[in-house]
Amino acid sequence: MTSGARSIVDPKICNGRRMIRRTKIICTIGPATASYDKLKAMKKAGMDVARINMSHATQRDALKIIRWVKKLNHNTLFPIAVLLDTQGPEIRTGEISDPMNLATGDIVSLSVRDDRFVEQNSIMVNYDELVDVVKVGGTITVDNGLINFKVLEKDSNKLTCEVLDGGTLGSRKHVNLPGIRVNLPAITGKDLSDIEFGCENDVDYIALSFVRKPEDVLELKRLLASKRSRAGVVAKIEDQEGVTNVNRIAALSDGVMVARGDLGIET
């Protein structure tokens, strides 16, 4: 373990009595805070856990943070834990050469990514089962809910949609399918590489994104056991399926995080 930080107790003085703060403060470490001095100041201010978001950080970035935390934890009563947060499976729009300006009422088509299928006002999506799972009358949200579509009709390879909330669409924007059970792996190839990296560097926790069912947690636990890692498992609840199964997921996890952004869109 990086720090033994899973048993942190942080005594504070309140009304002349020594108190134990049970609520932990988790801080996401980004470009503005990724330095030894900044981490030291954050620890002094009360940070308990340094979160590394692997959706944005490289393994090289993460290794620097882990080493700084280990240095801070040397000979300290209250060590910081390191939490490695996986990117998880994602549905995204494709690459486009120029941003698309979408106005409310515009008609566009959404299709599974295919370089052979090109038409004006067509948006490619990297989820093979898109056309199969979305129903006419359903909604699709893009770019964290900034752009919304209503499905008007569908055929074998595309969805014809009306823009409900317009905006400027760029490349590789996040797509949500509210209320739909998606068929995506619990642990992607990138996640596997990042988890193995975390095990090699003794992180304290692995946060698994888009946990939908108890089997997702068990899959991660088997992987950690195979690497002889003692890292705790934090399950991130990000869609309706995860909410439905949250009690069984929580029973298998060391912690649960509610991803309010994605969950707010999905539900």
Task: Locate the predicted segments by residue.
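Non-catalytic helical/linker scaffolds that mediate oligomerization, partner binding
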Residues: 4-267
